[in-house]
Amino acid sequence: MIFLDYDGTLVPIIMNPEESYADAGLLSLISDLKERFDTYIVTGRSPEEISRFLPLDINMICYHGACSKINGQIVYNNGSDRFLGVFDRIYEDTRSWVSDFPGLRIYRKNLAVLYHLGLMGADMKPKLRSRIEEIARIFGVETYYGKMIIELRVPGVNKGSAIRSVRGERPAIIAGDDATDEAAFEANDDALTIKVGEGETHAKFHVADYIEMRKILKFIEMLGVQKKQ
């Protein structure tokens, strides 16, 4: 089995996250890979976003493990669907913040609200962070700090437990670039784990960037071809 993060692992992280479309080379690579191996995209994004960026019939673990899309069917993990209304309220209560924080972008997802700080001035970020943390306390949701983003998400779920529930004890390759992927590495220490990019990690292996990761996946795909011959 193969479990792959999307942003930063298969595609570069860009300033406009709504434009993270897979290029032709990646589409071809993942299409070939999933024909030979049981392959999942594991991401903080929604199923709809990944389906738009990577228009392939592929299984997914989304919202950092809060839901999955398997064989075309959406499954909410650990009762996460009870938070759907909570995130509606959070978005309604905070969407006016774009007037208070120039450059802030707010994205409503079914099981998350994401605040993108990439275009904000550094002097305003601590104040915004305090506001978001207060909202998290009020609504009982989890705060995640990523690259240029702060996200409010379903508490008590993570990529690690979601991957483990899918794979059981089957051999697996798991790759990711961000802090959320560390939970996947820790909970699946019997897998072949790959950290993409710089930073300390629990992964067994490390590659420089998404370009190197694609090269590894191409090699794995070719091994799959040879095995079938």
UniProtKB/Swiss-Prot annotation:
* InterPro entries xrefs: HAD-like_sf, HAD-SF_hydro_IIB, HAD_sf, OTSB-like, Trehalose_PPase
Q: Which reaction does it catalyse?
A: alpha,alpha-trehalose 6-phosphate + H2O = alpha,alpha-trehalose + phosphate
The cofactor(s) it depends on are:
Mg(2+)
Which parts of the sequence bind Mg(2+)? D5, D7, D177
Gene Ontology MF terms in the entry: magnesium ion binding; trehalose-phosphatase activity
Q: Which UniProt keywords apply?
A: Hydrolase, Magnesium, Metal-binding
- GO biological process terms held by the UniProt record: trehalose biosynthetic process
Annotated binding of substrate, by residue? D5, Y6, D7
Quick one: which pathway? Glycan biosynthesis; trehalose biosynthesis
What does the record note about the induction of this protein? By Tre6P.
Top-level class of the enzyme under EC nomenclature: hydrolase
**Which sites are catalytic?**
D5
The record's disulfide annotation reads none
What is its biological role?
Removes the phosphate from trehalose 6-phosphate (Tre6P) to produce free trehalose. Also catalyzes the dephosphorylation of para-nitrophenyl phosphate (pNPP), but with lesser efficiency (in vitro).
Family from the record: Belongs to the trehalose phosphatase family.
Name this polypeptide is given:
Trehalose-6-phosphate phosphatase-related protein
